[in-house]
Structures are given as structure tokens and as C-alpha cells.
Amino acid sequence: MTPSSRNFTAPSGHTIHYLQSGTSSGSLLVCLHGLGGSSETFLPVLQALPTSSNIVLVDFPGFGKSALNKASKPLTVVGTVLDIHSLISSIRDGAGTSNSEKIIFIGHSFGAIIALHYAAKHPDAVAGLALLGAGRAAGHIPAVRQRMLELASNVRNVGIDFAANAAAQSNFYADTLERSASPSARESVRKAVAASDPEGYAQTCEALVDLCHTDPDYSNIEAPTVFVAGDKDIISPADRSNELSKLMGGESWVVTVKSGHQQALEDPEGVGEALIQLLARVKDSP
């Protein structure tokens, strides 16, 4: 599958770039990346996705090829959910598909948070969720809030390389004789973050710990959901996926893969198996 490149101007004023693959008339499968990532985050697992689906890999504003409109209001979680909803409506209109057709979301980190908010707000619109390194609202935790606000400040004042170099460490784990992270994987993450718009990165950091950002009502989400946790993820430990799984309103389970915070990059086979599990559950759902 060779994805095609497209753009959409959201109501927020941001231009959202996305890659489209599979069958345009098929059911939507939307992939949402994490902080410092892009649509390319999901390329290692693209072959595990059904070509009969309309596969959409999104670049959030300020990441990948999506431009940040600096004249727009600062990025927020709620605003990003609205932009994704508008994008989905536009794609459906262009394909001539029904709004009643349910969506599968694959989200990584920040993208998993957006997918959870979307599913809680539009539970009848979602067929299933695959959430890699999922997180929760953390603005009420002083240490986390301070760390993210300091990261945003350093990116603005020192430059995006500050975040890029930090991510190449924090997204992985300490190397040992028994196991070490691939240098090429670290460099891939460093390059992805370094290519981000500094202001977009900073605003996303602030959005994640904004006091207005609270957890959605997870019990509203009844679609089958698989949480994919890295066994050495220090940003979003496996315990977080386990606790989130217990809060969901429908069938939910956790798959642990061999990775840090970059599940699709480090263990594409393990993530692919989790996606196949989800697709089977979705197919069997009423």
C-alpha cells in the first residue's frame, strides 16, 4: 500500500495533513500519533491493517506536514478532538460514505488520549480502539505539570533540539547487557521530534497538562479496546494501561510488547498481533 498525501483545513484554522491508504469507500481506520510523532509513526504496522478499510494517518498541527496556524487559538485537547471530528466528516463527504459507519482508532500516547476523548464523546461512532502507550490527564499532578511546562519553555527558548535529544532518551530505557534499544530507533525518534514545529510542540505540552484537560468518562466507551503497553515504557508504564482498561465500559484488554514508549517502532510484530486481535473482536461485535 502506497499512501496518498492530502490536506484539510480545519475550523480551528490549522491545515491538517494526512496520508490515506487502503480503500476510500471502506470503513474508516484513523491513526493518531503522539507528541513529537507524525503519520509516519504507524508505517511499521501498516501492513497489519486491512486494505479494505479507508486508512487515514493524521499529522496533528505542528507535526509532520501539518502547519500550525499561529494566528489560531492555542492548541487544546478539546479543540484537537473537534478538528479530528471535522476531518472525519470531510473524508466521509469526499468518499460518499455514511456517517453511521463506525470508526476504528489507533492512537499512540497523545493520540491515544485524543482517541479516548473522541470515543467517550461519540461512543456510537466508534467500532474499536487500539491504544499504544496511552496516557491520562495530568494537569492535577504538580510534578508532571511542572515538567511539561518546563519542557514547553525550553523548546521556545533553547530550541526544538532540546526536546529531540530528551525524547531519544525518555522514549526508551537504560541499555543493559541483556537488552538495549536500537540506536537507529533512538535516532528515528530524535529526527521526528527535531522536525516538529517548536511552537506546536510547546503548545501540545501545555495542552496535555492544562487544568481544563480532565479525563473523559471512560465508562461511556463500549467499543472493544486493546491497550498496547511497552514492557519498558517509563513514560506510560504498563500499570497505566491496566488501570485504564478496568475503567472502560465495554470489552477491554492489555497486550504487552517488547518496547519502551515507541511500541510500533520497536515491536511492530507484537503491535500487529494486537491489531489483528482487535479487528477480530470488532468483526464479531454486534
Where does each model-flagged region fall?
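Short beta-strand/loop motif that positions the catalytic acidic residue
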Residues: 221, 227-229, 233
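Conserved alpha/beta-hydrolase catalytic His-Asp/Glu region
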Residues: 139-146, 158-220
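Active-site glycine-rich loops that stabilize anionic/oxyanionic intermediates
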Residues: 34-37, 109
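Flexible "cap/lid" loop of the alpha/beta hydrolase fold
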Residues: 116-121, 125-158
